């Protein structure tokens, strides 16, 4: 019941009120409360809650921390737009609207964390009958192995606000990662989650090579989502 209305916790905090949620016994509900800053969680499973609290990741907002690649040109305004704001008056409205979908945009980072998670808020929360939610507004994580980018896993969305563990139980060593953003939706906020005490920095490798970009233009047949 308490998960039906997302905004009520923020409204309470804005009024200076503390939030206590009672009888939270499932791990999913516990995580939901933690993600939204519930002040007090009352549960019949205190050991499970303590274990979950110990396993929480340290989240890092991409804004001002990691570059966003895959744009027409390097621009920071808006951060998750494929076109810069100075182009908005000169392009068709339909084209500008499509540019707010983050298709082809990605961030790269290096970390020694044994797990990688993500918290992200999509712009529109689009839903289609013929395409899975993962294809519409999910994330795809790749890792650089022996000079090649290997697919790791997808972050499956649940709605407008999402919190997903993408990969865990890796050996504690430094790795290069690339995270692709949603295809048919935009991003309002994106945070990368790593182990407490682990390090995360922007990648210094020029991979994929951005010196001579190839621009591909076409229908859904080109990108494969709705080819039929």
Please give the residue ranges for each predicted region.
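Short loop-to-alpha-helix "cap/lid" segments that border enzyme active sites
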Residues: 1-53
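Short beta-strand/turn micro-motifs composed of small residues
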Residues: 23, 181, 218
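Residue-level signal for short, function-critical loop segments
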Residues: 25, 124, 220
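Flexible, glycine-rich phosphate/dinucleotide-binding loops
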Residues: 28-30, 148, 223
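Glycine-centered flexibility sites
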Residues: 37-40, 104, 218, 224
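Glycine-rich nucleotide phosphate-binding loop and flanking beta-alpha elements
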Residues: 48-49, 124, 223
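Catalytic nucleophile-elbow at a beta strand-turn-alpha helix junction centered on a G-D-S/GDSL motif
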Residues: 211-228
